[in-house]
Amino acid sequence: AIFGLGDQVEYPESFVDGMGIIFCRLPFKQNVVGYTSTEGYKFYYSNAEKDGKFIGLAVDEDSQPELTPGRVKEWVAILKKEFI
């Protein structure tokens, strides 16, 4: 599972790109779990987006800090399902 911190307002063309960089270097990409929806985010491009989803949890404490607790809770629920 991968998570990343970014600022979609200041860096909409590279939002949470670090997640994508890590993902690309993994030898077993098919083992990555915890993909999340891109819904509710406003960005132009992200290396962390694959097939319309983020490859993990994208957190934006600069522009949407109020949404972080709910996003974390949803992500943990996804992870629990994928590991059980």
Feature map (PLM): residue ranges:
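FMN-binding flavodoxin-like domain, especially the glycine-rich phosphate-binding loop
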Residues: 1-84
